[in-house]
A protein has these predicted regions:
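Interfacial catalytic loop of ABC nucleotide-binding domains
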Residues: 59, 76, 83
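Nucleotide-binding/hydrolysis machinery
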Residues: 3-12, 16-24, 28, 33, ...
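AAA+/P-loop NTPase substrate/partner-engagement loops
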Residues: 51-73
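Conserved glycine(s) of the Walker
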Residues: 37
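Short glycine/serine/threonine-enriched helix-capping/active-site loop
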Residues: 59, 139, 166
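Short clusters of hydrophobic/aromatic residues that line enzyme substrate/ligand-binding pockets
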Residues: 4-5, 73, 79-80, 88, ...
Length: 178
Protein backbone atom coordinates (compact mmCIF):
# COMPACT_ATOMS: atom_id res chain seq x y z
CA UNK A 1 0.00 0.00 0.00
CA UNK A 2 1.38 3.40 -0.96
CA UNK A 3 0.76 6.55 1.08
CA UNK A 4 1.70 10.06 0.08
CA UNK A 5 3.07 12.04 3.01
CA UNK A 6 3.01 15.74 3.60
CA UNK A 7 5.66 17.69 5.51
CA UNK A 8 3.45 17.76 8.61
CA UNK A 9 3.59 13.95 8.76
CA UNK A 10 -0.07 13.25 8.08
CA UNK A 11 -0.91 10.66 5.39
CA UNK A 12 -2.78 11.98 2.35
CA UNK A 13 -5.81 9.78 3.13
CA UNK A 14 -6.04 11.26 6.64
CA UNK A 15 -5.69 14.80 5.29
CA UNK A 16 -8.65 14.09 3.02
CA UNK A 17 -10.69 12.98 6.06
CA UNK A 18 -9.62 16.11 7.95
CA UNK A 19 -10.80 18.31 5.07
CA UNK A 20 -14.26 16.71 5.15
CA UNK A 21 -14.56 16.66 8.94
CA UNK A 22 -13.42 20.28 9.29
CA UNK A 23 -16.43 21.45 7.30
CA UNK A 24 -18.71 20.11 10.04
CA UNK A 25 -19.00 20.81 13.74
CA UNK A 26 -19.32 17.11 14.54
CA UNK A 27 -17.49 15.20 17.24
CA UNK A 28 -14.47 13.11 16.31
CA UNK A 29 -12.63 10.16 17.81
CA UNK A 30 -9.00 9.68 16.76
CA UNK A 31 -7.54 6.22 17.37
CA UNK A 32 -3.88 5.25 17.26
CA UNK A 33 -0.94 4.17 19.35
CA UNK A 34 0.97 6.61 21.54
CA UNK A 35 3.16 8.92 19.50
CA UNK A 36 1.31 8.33 16.23
CA UNK A 37 0.20 11.95 15.79
CA UNK A 38 -3.33 12.01 17.20
CA UNK A 39 -2.86 15.48 18.69
CA UNK A 40 -1.42 16.74 15.41
CA UNK A 41 -4.52 15.52 13.58
CA UNK A 42 -6.81 17.15 16.18
CA UNK A 43 -4.95 20.46 15.83
CA UNK A 44 -5.28 20.26 12.05
CA UNK A 45 -9.04 19.68 12.31
CA UNK A 46 -9.35 22.71 14.59
CA UNK A 47 -7.14 24.88 12.39
CA UNK A 48 -9.24 24.12 9.30
CA UNK A 49 -12.60 24.50 11.08
CA UNK A 50 -14.79 27.57 11.51
CA UNK A 51 -13.66 27.57 15.17
CA UNK A 52 -10.01 28.17 14.22
CA UNK A 53 -9.89 31.66 15.72
CA UNK A 54 -11.04 30.36 19.13
CA UNK A 55 -9.28 28.28 21.77
CA UNK A 56 -7.90 24.79 21.26
CA UNK A 57 -7.65 23.19 24.71
CA UNK A 58 -6.14 19.78 25.52
CA UNK A 59 -7.05 17.69 28.55
CA UNK A 60 -5.20 14.41 29.06
CA UNK A 61 -7.37 11.74 30.68
CA UNK A 62 -4.38 9.62 31.66
CA UNK A 63 -2.62 12.25 33.76
CA UNK A 64 -5.21 13.11 36.38
CA UNK A 65 -6.95 11.34 39.24
CA UNK A 66 -10.76 11.48 39.48
CA UNK A 67 -11.00 14.53 41.77
CA UNK A 68 -8.49 16.59 39.82
CA UNK A 69 -9.93 15.50 36.50
CA UNK A 70 -13.40 16.68 37.41
CA UNK A 71 -12.11 20.11 38.45
CA UNK A 72 -9.85 20.38 35.39
CA UNK A 73 -12.74 19.57 33.04
CA UNK A 74 -15.70 21.31 34.70
CA UNK A 75 -14.02 23.99 36.79
CA UNK A 76 -14.25 24.64 40.50
CA UNK A 77 -16.11 27.14 42.68
CA UNK A 78 -14.06 27.76 45.81
CA UNK A 79 -15.44 28.55 49.26
CA UNK A 80 -14.16 32.14 48.99
CA UNK A 81 -16.31 32.69 45.89
CA UNK A 82 -13.47 32.53 43.38
CA UNK A 83 -13.78 30.38 40.28
CA UNK A 84 -11.21 28.17 38.62
CA UNK A 85 -12.37 27.73 35.04
CA UNK A 86 -12.19 24.23 33.61
CA UNK A 87 -11.28 23.05 30.14
CA UNK A 88 -14.88 23.17 28.94
CA UNK A 89 -15.23 26.88 29.67
CA UNK A 90 -11.75 27.65 28.38
CA UNK A 91 -12.67 25.92 25.11
CA UNK A 92 -16.06 27.64 24.78
CA UNK A 93 -16.73 28.48 21.10
CA UNK A 94 -13.54 26.54 20.28
CA UNK A 95 -12.33 22.95 20.41
CA UNK A 96 -11.61 20.64 23.34
CA UNK A 97 -9.36 17.63 22.78
CA UNK A 98 -9.77 14.97 25.45
CA UNK A 99 -6.63 12.90 25.00
CA UNK A 100 -6.77 9.29 26.23
CA UNK A 101 -10.54 9.49 26.71
CA UNK A 102 -10.49 5.79 27.67
CA UNK A 103 -8.85 6.71 30.98
CA UNK A 104 -11.70 8.89 32.23
CA UNK A 105 -13.50 7.40 35.27
CA UNK A 106 -17.03 6.14 34.57
CA UNK A 107 -18.64 8.70 36.90
CA UNK A 108 -17.11 11.54 34.92
CA UNK A 109 -18.02 9.88 31.61
CA UNK A 110 -21.70 10.22 32.58
CA UNK A 111 -21.19 13.94 33.25
CA UNK A 112 -19.50 14.39 29.88
CA UNK A 113 -22.49 12.68 28.29
CA UNK A 114 -24.76 15.28 29.90
CA UNK A 115 -22.63 18.10 28.47
CA UNK A 116 -22.89 16.56 25.01
CA UNK A 117 -26.65 16.19 25.37
CA UNK A 118 -27.55 19.48 27.09
CA UNK A 119 -24.56 21.74 26.30
CA UNK A 120 -24.34 22.66 29.99
CA UNK A 121 -22.78 21.47 33.23
CA UNK A 122 -22.14 22.46 36.84
CA UNK A 123 -18.71 23.31 38.17
CA UNK A 124 -17.40 21.28 41.11
CA UNK A 125 -19.04 22.80 44.24
CA UNK A 126 -21.25 24.88 41.95
CA UNK A 127 -25.02 25.13 41.92
CA UNK A 128 -25.70 26.98 38.66
CA UNK A 129 -25.60 25.54 35.16
CA UNK A 130 -22.87 26.81 32.84
CA UNK A 131 -23.70 26.74 29.12
CA UNK A 132 -21.01 25.95 26.57
CA UNK A 133 -20.62 25.59 22.83
CA UNK A 134 -17.62 23.31 22.35
CA UNK A 135 -16.48 21.04 19.57
CA UNK A 136 -15.26 17.84 21.19
CA UNK A 137 -12.46 15.75 19.74
CA UNK A 138 -11.36 12.66 21.66
CA UNK A 139 -8.35 10.45 21.18
CA UNK A 140 -7.44 7.02 22.44
CA UNK A 141 -4.65 4.52 22.13
CA UNK A 142 -6.98 1.79 23.43
CA UNK A 143 -9.73 0.01 21.53
CA UNK A 144 -12.83 1.70 22.96
CA UNK A 145 -15.10 -1.14 21.83
CA UNK A 146 -13.07 -3.55 23.96
CA UNK A 147 -13.16 -1.05 26.83
CA UNK A 148 -16.97 -1.06 26.54
CA UNK A 149 -17.05 -4.87 26.62
CA UNK A 150 -15.03 -5.04 29.85
CA UNK A 151 -17.04 -2.24 31.47
CA UNK A 152 -14.44 0.53 31.45
CA UNK A 153 -16.17 2.84 28.96
CA UNK A 154 -19.80 3.83 28.47
CA UNK A 155 -21.35 2.67 25.22
CA UNK A 156 -23.70 5.66 25.05
CA UNK A 157 -20.76 8.05 25.37
CA UNK A 158 -18.88 6.14 22.68
CA UNK A 159 -21.76 6.62 20.24
CA UNK A 160 -21.96 10.35 21.08
CA UNK A 161 -18.26 10.99 20.45
CA UNK A 162 -17.88 8.64 17.48
CA UNK A 163 -19.62 10.75 14.84
CA UNK A 164 -16.44 10.69 12.76
CA UNK A 165 -13.59 8.26 13.34
CA UNK A 166 -9.98 8.61 12.23
CA UNK A 167 -7.54 5.73 12.63
CA UNK A 168 -3.85 6.64 12.66
CA UNK A 169 -1.28 4.00 11.77
CA UNK A 170 1.72 3.49 14.07
CA UNK A 171 4.89 5.32 13.05
CA UNK A 172 6.69 2.04 12.34
CA UNK A 173 4.24 1.58 9.46
CA UNK A 174 4.95 5.12 8.23
CA UNK A 175 8.71 4.93 7.81
CA UNK A 176 8.95 8.17 5.82
CA UNK A 177 7.64 10.07 8.88
CA UNK A 178 10.52 8.92 11.11
Amino acid sequence: MLFLFYPEGIPHSTLHQIEKISLTDSRVIINGPSGSGKELVARKIHKKSKRNNKAFIILNGALLDKEKYEAELFGLEKDDGSILYGALEKANKGTLLIDQVSEIPLEIQSKILRVLTDQKFKRVNGSNDVSVDVRLICSSSKDLKKEIEIGNFREDLFHRINVFEINIEPLNQRISDI
